[in-house]
């Protein structure tokens, strides 16, 4: 079946983030429901995030020809589905560790590959990235709210059943054919792909990667233990799901209005805004559990995550064509994988001792990013 390329990309983001909207908020609850202790939950989630780091860093960059991006997404989706089925076969921690690593290793490259595909298509025909990417955020809202309700009715087992169907849907979407295929390299217009070593030799790239790794890594306590923390504070799973959804509603609004709001903002200024939001958000989360404050905390997600991601896409999009896939992979690996992985393992061991103090720790992680922003010029988009 052939569909419009922008619709293909929107569906790809939608199904991917529908799965992520189940996994990210609720997987710790599923592991807890299977009898896993908090410190081991931290280890399992951290191991998964390390494999996300490796998948984004090592697997995604192997796709050097843009014409092969869709094929790579299909293979990744298929292997991801095989591993998600593996979660149904046992709950011993060693087996869960194996499946967790395998699932994240192949699930993680799908995001930089999709973003690289978006970047490739933007060079072939014009479209508003924010309005396409927003469908991923909408999917996250729906899945996190829906899963919270299903947990309230059927318990933690609803999490695994829901994500099974969701990942299978992702596989089906990748099998569709977009109307305009990404254009590969030709002999007359060959793109020189730079190495990671060449990229990291540039000071602005190093500062950029460190800055976004801190800002995204500061989400580790929230991603791993907010659901457990809020349930212990007396909130039901459905309320937790709605709180997560609220954060992504704010994300949707910013993605939708990003062109109007931040058209003339440089990546450096966007990172400053994200850093300030991070310090405020995690400080509030570590101090209060009242619902009105949690609503404010979740609205600030549009600053801590969305603005940071927009800054990253702006910084990466301004680079040479041969740098985009590798820099996108490095961003996904270090910011969305490595930084969060390290902080998740630390949070797992410290949560039983610090509880709400974990979120103050996240505020301290975000703070240095304010001073590490790369020097870049503003662009018109």
Put a short name on every predicted segment.
Residues 159-175, 357-375:
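Symmetry-related core transmembrane helices of the 12-TM Major Facilitator Superfamily/SLC fold
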């Amino acid at each position: 079946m052939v569909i419009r390329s922008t619709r293909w990309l929107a569906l790809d983001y939608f199904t991917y983030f529908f799965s992520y909207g189940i996994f990210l908020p609720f997987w710790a609850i599923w592991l807890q429901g299977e009898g896993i202790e908090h410190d081991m939950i931290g280890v399992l989630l951290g191991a998964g995030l390390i494999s996300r780091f490796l998948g984004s860093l090592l697997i995604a960059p192997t796709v050097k020809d843009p014409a092969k991006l869709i094929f790579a997404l299909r293979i990744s989706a298929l292997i991801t589905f095989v591993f998600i089925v593996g979660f149904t076969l046992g709950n011993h921690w060693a087996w869960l560790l194996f499946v967790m690593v395998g699932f994240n290793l192949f699930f993680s490259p799908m995001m930089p590959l999709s973003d690289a595909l978006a970047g490739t298509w933007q060079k072939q025909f014009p479209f508003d990235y924010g309005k396409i990417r927003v469908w991923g955020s909408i999917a996250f809202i729906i899945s996190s709210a829906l899963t919270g309700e299903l947990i309230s009715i059927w318990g933690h087992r609803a999490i695994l059943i829901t994500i099974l169907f969701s990942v299978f849907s992702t596989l089906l979407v990748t099998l569709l054919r977009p109307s305009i295929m990404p254009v590969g390299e030709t002999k007359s217009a060959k793109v020189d792909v730079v190495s990671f070593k060449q990229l990291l030799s540039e000071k602005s790239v190093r500062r950029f990667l460190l800055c976004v790794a801190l800002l995204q890594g500061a989400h580790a306590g929230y991603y791993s233990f907010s659901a457990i923390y809020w349930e212990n504070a007396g909130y039901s799973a459905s309320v937790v799901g709605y709180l997560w959804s609220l954060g992504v509603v704010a994300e949707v609004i910013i993605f939708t209005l990003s062109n109007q709001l931040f058209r003339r903002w440089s990546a450096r200024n966007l990172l400053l805004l994200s850093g300030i939001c991070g310090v405020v958000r995690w400080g509030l989360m570590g101090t209060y559990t009242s619902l009105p404050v949690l609503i404010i905390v979740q609205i600030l997600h549009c600053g801590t995550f969305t603005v940071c991601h927009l800054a990253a896409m702006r910084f990466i999009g301004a680079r040479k064509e041969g740098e985009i896939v590798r820099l996108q992979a490095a961003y996904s690996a270090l910011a969305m994988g490595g930084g969060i992985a390290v902080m998740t393992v630390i949070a797992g061991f410290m949560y039983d001792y610090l509880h709400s103090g974990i979120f103050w720790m996240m505020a301290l992680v975000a703070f240095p990013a304010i001073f590490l922003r790369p020097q870049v010029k503003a662009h018109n988009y």
